[in-house]
Amino acid sequence: MLYGGATMDCALMETVFHDVPYTAGFKTFDKGKPVGQAHSTVEVAQPLRVVDLASAPLRKLGITRKQLIDTEKDRRPVTRQWAEALYRQCPDAQGLSWASRQDDSARAVALFGDRIPNGALKPLGASRAWWTTAMLMTRRSI
């Protein structure tokens, strides 16, 4: 699974800062989480088929955004089961897309790596360590 976002802020919020509490006020962050991880900026070179997890399509599946997207860490096993079920039931789907929980101004994606053909994602520059980018972002408000 490849996680991403339409913006760097969205990508950070959906990965490195995913488990930061969804509440106002002071927040803590495990500085060890991004160590050893990297991020890349890519261009989508060919159309990808993603399952839209916006509110209207979720209603058709009988689940709400609050039950699937706007969840805390303890619900991750359930969200993983939904992703696995959508993977099985939608053999042409190459991933999932939704409005980010912590940055709802941008779309987040989870791409099924085995369904993304070579050349579909073109790197724009070298990959960088998440640690550097995450530390720059913590100097701003999250």
Predicted regions and their residues:
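Extended catalytic/binding region for NAD+/ADP-ribose chemistry, centered on the ART fold
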Residues: 1-23
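Active-site and NAD+-binding cores of ADP-ribose-processing enzymes
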Residues: 21-142
